[in-house]
Amino acid sequence: MSENLIIFNAKVVTPLGFSARKGKEMAELRILEKATVEVVDGIITYVGPNRGEVRDGYYHHFWHYNARGKCLLPGFVDSHTHFVFGGERAEEFSWRLKGESYMSIMQRGGGIASTVQATRELSFIHLRSKAEGLLKKMTAMGITTVEGKSGYGLNRETELLQLKVMRSLNKDEGVRVDIVPTFLGAHALPDEYKERPDDYIDFLIRELLPVIQRDSLAEFCDVFCEEGVFSIEQSRRLLTAAGDYGLLPKLHADEIVPLGGAELAAELGAVSADHLLHASDAGIEAMARKGVVATLLPLTAFALKEPYARGRDMIDAGCAVALATDLNPGSCFSGSIPLTFALACIHMQLTVEEAITALTLNGAAALNRADSIGSIEVGKKGDFVVLDSDNYHILPYYVGMNCVNTTIKGGMLYPSV
């Protein structure tokens, strides 16, 4: 199919800009009725009123798409997922219903450790096949760019294997989503390094970072900076070393306790800090000053029955807030964009407009891609979502139900049915 596309009779709904929108800016959307969007070789070349040339047959080398007044949004950017893994952890859901916490399950050998074992047992082919199946479900909900993390290997071989699976999927023209790889070797402490976290950080720096740089396997380095996992100092040391190897810093921060991860993210100039359920006021203010994107994951708080991150407070403090699914096999086995919208609006007090910005332009900024995706503007990729309605407020209103009619990736059409 050609990557030349003309979309007409669309209701364009988009944030604007080539960087993250902060604070009050998040509520500002451009809305164009009866609009045309032109895509040439996968790149947007025109956004504006309907053109007579469409009727006159000027675009005879283009695919034509009549949006019939439906909303046309930027493709959704899911900037925090763990979609490459082996096994499943369905039994943990029942354990949590009986009162066990995420950390108590992890400490008794469940949680991440059980996924690590299952992932280490899978071949490249089986790991890739499982990941591709999850991606297909996610793209049907309008996701056109997704971040993926390693972190279920915790050894040299399997950490690299996860990253190579993502690279393989990214090169496959049949996969309808761009994948942004993140190295999360510091996701948990493996049994081989039990009670030796400093030695494990040394191992990651010595054995993995040079290979990841050499083979261009990741763009970011993430760390689970949390009490009982990796300390502030250990996180600082790894992320600083990763920067020397060309990887940009991200953090799982202040998810379980207010450890100071948000403050560390600001100190290091991290691209994003994620979770932030227990981020302090000082941490939020520091992130706002330094331009660290606050990536909030409402599906995880929902699944764990935890308090939601203070999205409203973060926006009011001037933060750039992004939303993501945190799809993973344990704490949140869901890639539901519709439910993410609903929970963010209901429990984090985001407006619908702010939530749209959070799942498009600010999600792109959390992946260092706001210059090329995340809004419908000339020069950006032709990644779009067509809703089933001319009213974008259905995004949270359809609680958990998919309201995406068609996903358009690089100018190519993919109906959601």
From Swiss-Prot:
Residues binding Zn(2+), per UniProt: 80, 82, 252, 326
Catalytic activity: 4-imidazolone-5-propanoate + H2O = N-formimidoyl-L-glutamate
Primary enzyme class: hydrolase
Keywords: Cytoplasm, Histidine metabolism, Hydrolase, Iron, Metal-binding, Zinc
Needed co-factor(s): Zn(2+); Fe(3+)
Subcellular location: Cytoplasm
Binding-site positions, N-formimidoyl-L-glutamate: 152, 328, 330
Entry's cofactor comment: Binds 1 zinc or iron ion per subunit.
Protein's GO biological process: L-histidine catabolic process to glutamate and formamide; L-histidine catabolic process to glutamate and formate
E.C. designation(s): 3.5.2.7
Pfam families according to UniProt: Amidohydro_1
Gene3D superfamilies attached to this UniProt entry: Metal-dependent hydrolases, Urease, subunit C, domain 1
InterPro entries the record matches: Amidohydro-rel, HutI, Metal-dep_hydrolase_composite, Metal_Hydrolase
Pathway of action: Amino-acid degradation; L-histidine degradation into L-glutamate; N-formimidoyl-L-glutamate from L-histidine: step 3/3
Domain of life: Bacteria
Primary residence: cytoplasm
The protein's role, per its UniProt record: Catalyzes the hydrolytic cleavage of the carbon-nitrogen bond in imidazolone-5-propanoate to yield N-formimidoyl-L-glutamate. It is the third step in the universal histidine degradation pathway.
Similarity-based family: Belongs to the metallo-dependent hydrolases superfamily. HutI family.
Protein name (record): Imidazolonepropionase
Organism expressing this protein natively: Bacteroides fragilis (strain ATCC 25285 / DSM 2151 / CCUG 4856 / JCM 11019 / LMG 10263 / NCTC 9343 / Onslow / VPI 2553 / EN-2)
Name of the gene encoding the protein in the UniProt record: hutI
